[in-house]
Amino acid sequence: MKFVDEATILAAAGDGGNGCVSFRREKYIPRGGPDGGDGGDGGDVWLLADENLNTLIDYRFEKNFRAERGQNGQSCDCTGKRGKDIIIKVPVGTRVLDSGTNEVMGDMTRHAQRLMVAKGGFHGLGNTRFKSSVNRAPRQKTGGTKGEIREIQLELMLLADVGMLGLPNAGKSTFIRAVSAAKPKVADYPFTTLVPSLGVVRMDNEQSFVVADIPGLIEGAADGAGLGIRFLKHLERCQVLLHLIDLAPVDESDPVENARIIVTELERYSENLASKPRWLVFNKADLLDPEEAASRANAIAKVLGWEEKYYLISAANRDGVKALCWDVMAFINAHPKEQAAPEAAPEKVEFMWDDYHRDQLQQEEAEETLDDDWDEDGVETIYQR
């Protein structure tokens, strides 16, 4: 299935149902009291995280989602039926933004997580609500409010502990094949990897971590060169970045300059991503003599001003890979991810005293003093026997 990590949809919640103006009519009771019911609330639009999905391709074709409208109130104090909610399933790891304001509405980071993106309209009030000792036959009602309509931007961001960085053909896909059961395509030409891929590294029966491989970066990626930087967002959730440097580039380019290109593109993309822990990993050591590989790695680290530990590996032969993975596992255990705050329960709204209805009542009361026939204009009265 094609990997699609961005989509824009329109979420329209249902409108609230209108209140009803009705009067009770029974045998020997020609002038019964009001019995108009309230309308029903409009349906909401929800997002549901599903771990069985891994792409947003479905929303490239189906873009409009509309919840059901609440039914109007009826006589005999019958409240209208609430509109049905609509549930949109998205992959775990989806970030939800409001296209109009660019506000982050939420992150779908765990299976079965729910997020309301459009609230249904409030129900209108029937004339029963307006009866009083001085107004025994009210012909007033309120209409339901409109449901929210939002254009939502969905961005799928892979959930991984470790992210791979490097130029094309630095050996990122070979590394993932060496440490996990993932089998990304490997070839001797640039941009073999066209979409992100994930691999699970199992250290023992109880410990494991997830590695994300993204297409390689080149100079000018921030300006759209190559595959651009659109896949860098998949590394924002990672705890540590592994920066792979080819010790013996086929094109005889300078490894120091290659490393600086990656750092520059990271900084141009996001300060947050550039500030993440980054480990230097020199790959393809098997193409050189052990002494030459060690001296070349040491020289590159000095020129880069790298004072921390670096790693010398051969992903193809799996030399030094196991030790690197154990160090990564130890780092992840020592720096656990922050737990997301528990979701607050939606606040219950008492619709009788909602601002919308209160404003409507105040407006109608003001009109009473100007119009002696306020109860005869535009009112549909239902008489029931």
Curated annotation (Swiss-Prot):
User: Tell me, which GO biological process terms does this entry list?
Assistant: ribosome biogenesis
Give the matching PROSITE patterns.
G_OBG, GTP1_OBG, OBG
Q: What InterPro entries does this protein's entry cite?
A: G_OBG (IPR031167), GTP-bd (IPR006073), GTP-bd_Obg/CgtA (IPR014100), GTP1-OBG_CS (IPR006074), GTP1_OBG_dom (IPR006169), GTP1_OBG_dom_sf (IPR036726), OBG_GTPase (IPR045086), P-loop_NTPase (IPR027417)
UniProt: GTP binding residues: 166-173, 191-195, 213-216, 283-286, 314-316
**Residue spans of biased composition, Acidic residues class:** 362-379
Signal peptide location in the record? none
Q: What is its EC number?
A: 3.6.5.-
Q: Which GO terms describe its molecular function?
A: GTP binding; GTPase activity; magnesium ion binding
Tell me the protein family, please: Belongs to the TRAFAC class OBG-HflX-like GTPase superfamily. OBG GTPase family.
Q: What does this protein do?
A: An essential GTPase which binds GTP, GDP and possibly (p)ppGpp with moderate affinity, with high nucleotide exchange rates and a fairly low GTP hydrolysis rate. Plays a role in control of the cell cycle, stress response, ribosome biogenesis and in those bacteria that undergo differentiation, in morphogenesis control.
Can you state the subunit structure given in the record?
Answer: Monomer.
The protein in question is named GTPase Obg
Organism source for this protein?
Answer: Sodalis glossinidius (strain morsitans)
